[in-house]
Amino acid sequence: MELVVKGADALTVSETTFGRDFNEALVHQVVVAYAAGARQGTRAQKTRSDVSGGGAKPWRQKGTGRARAGTIRSPLWRTGGVTFAARPQDHSQKVNKKMYRGAMKSILSELVRQERLIVVDNFSVEAPKTKELAAKLKELDLSDVLIVTGELDENLFLAARNLYKVDVRDAATIDPVSLIAFDKIVMTAAAVKQVEEMLA
């Protein structure tokens, strides 16, 4: 199949990478796993066994009229432990390489079908100036956009840092979440070829 390239001849690409059916279940599973892997998982609370103090019985068992109590660390008490305390845990999920590649191909194919993938011959700015990139994006009528280049262009990266809903990645660092998070994806022809090789 061929992809239209702005400012150059059409680019011949693999049907299996850019023209396959959309597998929603697979994409969902991979995106959820990717997001889960990004979690720190370092939250922690204290159970009644972790809270300091509480060795002595607060008051005697009978005769005071108060409810019986054996420790000030009880979850019923203020400053006591937490009943089902959170513990540090690893949230990462295993995703097979074949599944990951399949999900990426599904997403790229769907972007092509929805005309959200724009392929350009080259995309760069002369200086690391936000104003220059903003003007270029306005000219192309792009606002919510991920720009993917073959190699990371430092000028382009620095120019995009202060723009809302604009991100710059090189082909090697794109992921399922970044591809579905933006309204439009602008890829250079070199990036398309690189992505195709990565997912082959």
UniProtKB/Swiss-Prot annotation:
UniProt keyword annotations, A-Z: Ribonucleoprotein, Ribosomal protein, RNA-binding, rRNA-binding
GO cellular component, one term: ribosome
Protein name stated in the entry: Large ribosomal subunit protein uL4
Role description: One of the primary rRNA binding proteins, this protein initially binds near the 5'-end of the 23S rRNA. It is important during the early stages of 50S assembly. It makes multiple contacts with different domains of the 23S rRNA in the assembled 50S subunit and ribosome.
DNA repair found in the keyword field: no
Biological source species: Photobacterium profundum (strain SS9)
Family to which the UniProt record says this protein belongs: Belongs to the universal ribosomal protein uL4 family.
Subunit-structure text: Part of the 50S ribosomal subunit.
GO annotation, biological process: translation
MF GO annotations: rRNA binding; structural constituent of ribosome
Region of interest: Disordered: 42-65
InterPro entries: Ribosomal_uL4 (IPR002136), Ribosomal_uL4-like (IPR013005), Ribosomal_uL4_dom_sf (IPR023574)
Gene3D superfamilies cross-referenced by the UniProt entry: 3.40.1370.10
Signal peptide range: none
